[in-house]
Every structure is written in structure tokens, then in C-alpha cells.
Amino acid sequence: RTSSSAASDVYKRQLSNSEAHYLSTGPEIWEQMGGRIDHFVVGVGTGGTISGVGRFLKEKNNKIKIWGIDSFGSIFKKYHETGEFDKNEIYPYLTEGIGEDILPENVDFKIIDHFEKVTDENAAIYARRLAKKEGILAGYSCGAAIAGLHQLKSNFKKNENVVVLLHDSGTRYIGKVYNDEWMKKQGFKLD
């Protein structure tokens, strides 16, 4: 059997995922922001959100920058920069929901301006900060998105509007990211 006929190929080929974000999430963001968007920042896993929303936003205003957040241990950033699928970039990481060791067909690398890699530790720390300082119990990939936002801040001008999409809830991470013992076991500092 070919990989495209195997059941495991479902994950790689979620093309309706991207289309759903093009038809719903992208227009919703555009409308809520009144079209005043300069940057869109989001974690990248299957690629559906960044590709669908990114395509919609670029069609509205091709000057909008699309920033993908990636994990160390994932291949997206290097592939985007070089076109090379480098197996040496692939190694285990903890952040769930972003990064890949495959190239999902959903990821439209042409509309993504830049990938920013975030460490597992920073993703966890920023998820915890969101809960502590903003009252948002967000997931691990959301922490990565916020950590990436902070790493990218020198790319944003003072009066520009930056939209960051937070994908998941922190309820799945109560025993991990939000657990001090888990953080210590990983060697992560407590914030």
C-alpha cells in the first residue's frame, strides 16, 4: 500500500482543516479586528490554522506577516528556510500540539513569512504565566505561541496590531505544565 492509502495518512492530509480556517477563523479574526492586522502568530502542528487563516489574511492584505511557532525537535523551521527535510532536526520534545517530524500537506509554506522555535521550558513557563497573570488556563502550545511572541517582539512596531491565536485549553495539562513536581522533574524553572 502507498502511504496515501493508509489510515495513518489521515493526519498528513487534513486539507479540509485548512479550508475550514480559511472560511471561518480567518474571516472572524479579520472582522473582529476591523481589518487592522499587521501580524498573525500561531503554533503550527498539522498546519490547518496557519495555512487557512494565513491565506485569508494575505488575500485581504499581503503585507500582513504570518509567523509560525515551532518546537525544537521539529522540522518546520529548517524546511521553510532551506527546502531541506533534515532528519537531524528531528528529536524528542515535550510541547504538544505544535511541531512535526513529517511534512503535513496542510502546511502552505509559501504564505508563512517566518518560523520561530521555542523551547519546551519556555512554552511551559509562558503557559503558566498566562494562567497566573491573565487568568487564562491555556495549553502547552499556547504557552509556546506567547513565548514565540516575546521572542519576535523586535519585529513589531509600536502601533502595529499583532493577533496571537491560542489553540488549546490548559485542562489537559494540569498534571504536567501546571504541576510544580512535573516542572521540576523536567528540570524547568518555576516562574
Feature locations, PLM:
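Phosphate-binding loop/pocket of nucleotide- and phosphate-handling active sites
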Residues: 147-191
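Short glycine/serine/threonine-rich phosphate/pyrophosphate-binding segments
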Residues: 44-54, 76, 141-149
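Single conserved hydrophobic/aromatic residue that forms the stacking wall/gate
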Residues: 1-7, 11
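Glycine-rich ThDP/TPP pyrophosphate-binding loop and its adjacent helix/strand module
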Residues: 20-65
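Terminal helix/beta-alpha structural elements that buttress the NAD(P)+-binding lobe
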Residues: 39, 136-140, 144-146, 150-152, ...
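Active-site/ligand-binding loops adjacent to catalytic centers
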Residues: 59-140, 177-191
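A glycine-rich, Thr/Ser-enriched phosphate-binding loop motif common to dinucleotide/cofactor-binding enzymes
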Residues: 13-28, 139-144
